[in-house]
């Protein structure tokens, strides 16, 4: 007696389950890549990973040796990270550049004396944010920014300013200090 071959039929339910499974795998993979590699250019990231430093930093001059910093703040209870200009003054104080800060998601969610994280070259530094309102301190931070951008500026989002550029009124800054 000859056996008749059994043919499997793909049901719509099976196809839907397979499609949903593949979608979940792609989404989980995408989130995994995003959380470990971003912030990227203008795309914000999640948690900053890296070698967390446990020694307090008092002289931040080394930030002037990297084009951009990555910061992590907390918004709605979740980590949110971005790339931005950071600069140190000649006396080693650390500042973040924030043009039009009130329009930026991260800038609206940083409270005074809030803890966050700063990542440079794979090292993560726990920091405390302080919004600067003193005009003299704003001018010192602006001068440090202009000086640093003479070396690292020039990209589409980070043009090189004139060496004697005046600080725009909508520009603000945060002073960071070590949280350790």
What residues fall within each predicted segment?
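Hydrophobic membrane-insertion alpha-helices, especially the h-region
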Residues: 17-35
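Short, conserved active-site entrance elements at the starts or edges of catalytic domains
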Residues: 34-80
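Short beta-strand segments
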Residues: 65-101, 119, 128-129
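Short, structured beta-strand-loop surface elements
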Residues: 101-180
């Amino acid at each position: 007696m000859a056996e008749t071959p059994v043919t499997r039929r793909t049901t719509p339910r099976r196809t839907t389950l397979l499609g949903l499974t593949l979608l979940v795998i792609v989404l989980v993979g995408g989130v995994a890549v995003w959380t470990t590699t971003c912030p990227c250019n203008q795309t914000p990231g999640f948690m900053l990973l890296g070698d967390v430093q446990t020694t307090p930093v008092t002289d931040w001059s080394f930030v002037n040796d990297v084009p951009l910093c990555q910061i992590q703040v907390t918004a709605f209870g979740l980590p949110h990270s971005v790339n931005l200009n950071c600069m140190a003054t000649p006396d080693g104080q650390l500042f973040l550049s924030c043009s039009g800060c009130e329009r930026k998601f991260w800038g609206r969610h940083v409270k005074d004396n809030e803890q966050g994280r700063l990542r440079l070259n794979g090292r993560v530094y726990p920091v405390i944010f302080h919004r600067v309102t003193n005009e003299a301190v704003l001018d010192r931070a602006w001068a440090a920014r202009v000086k640093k951008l003479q070396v690292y500026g020039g990209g589409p989002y980070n043009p090189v300013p004139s060496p004697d550029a005046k600080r725009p009124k909508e520009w603000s800054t945060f002073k960071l200090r070590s949280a350790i």
